[in-house]
A protein has these predicted regions:
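Divalent metal-dependent phosphate-bond-processing catalytic cores, especially two-metal-ion Mg2+/Mn2+ enzymes
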Residues: 17-43, 55, 110-226
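Acidic catalytic motifs of isoprenoid enzymes
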Residues: 19, 37, 70-91, 105
Length: 226
């Protein structure tokens, strides 16, 4: 089976099986397209990058279904990927590389990306939380979770201690206490420091400015300022 045929089969599998709202097919395809952009001109195994990107969140439903907070969707995605990749004729070396990329894409763990393919996946995945799409995703979550459109807290550390689980997935305990402003302070503005590639950092700088400017305009409108 040719590489392009294998990638198309993976795309079909992902389209048919992605059921987790937090890690849906739209997110996967955005990350996939961004990986293609970031990888232009790079000497990498493009089939490894494409396969890993398409499968990186396939285990999201398992994490969401685990109320204990001990399940890591990156680990689960790597487990699910292995037999599928074997079925499609990937070599053991490629399967191992793809699994490593998937496992290391998670922001909240110490599994750091080592290869360029893994770094590109990590960067593209994080960029999807920023910019216009980041605003859209966050406010979709805000509406679904009945959280605040606008809310700031005086002590971020105290908020984290009070409202964040220390389990592997770092879940928010009470989503109704959360807000875009809090999410920006505790995570989004720090993403750029974690990125690996210069291309991604350049994109992140632009997207962070958009996000920050949006929050500034939102605050003025909430407070009735002209």
């Amino acid at each position: 089976m040719k590489g392009s045929d294998r990638i198309e089969k993976i795309k079909k599998y992902v389209r048919d099986t992605m059921v987790c709202p937090g890690h849906n097919i739209e997110h996967v395809l955005r990350v996939y397209n961004l990986c293609l952009t970031l990888s232009k001109g790079e000497k990498i195994d493009h089939e490894v990058l494409e396969a890993a990107t398409l499968l990186h969140d396939i285990g999201g439903a398992r994490e969401m279904a685990d109320s204990t907070g001990k399940t890591d969707h990156a680990i689960e995605s790597a487990k699910i990927a292995k037999p599928l990749l074997e079925e499609f004729g990937f070599s053991e070396d490629k399967i191992s590389h793809i699994q490593d990329c998937i496992i290391s894409h998670r922001y909240k763990t110490d599994n750091k990306p080592k290869t360029l393919e893994a770094k590109l996946l990590f960067d593209a995945d994080k960029l999807d939380a920023l910019g216009a799409i980041g605003v859209a995703r966050l406010f979709a979550w805000i509406g679904k979770s009945n959280a605040h459109i606008y809310k700031k807290v005086d002590d971020i550390d105290l908020y984290l201690e009070d409202n964040f689980s220390k389990k592997i997935n770092g879940r928010i305990k009470d989503k109704t206490k959360h807000s875009p402003q809090i999410e920006y302070e505790i995570k989004l503005k720090h993403i750029i420091k974690r990125l690996n590639t210069d291309k991604a950092k350049k994109i992140a700088k632009k997207r962070l400015k958009f996000f920050k400017d949006f929050l500034g305009e939102l605050e003025k409108e909430v407070k009735g300022k002209l």
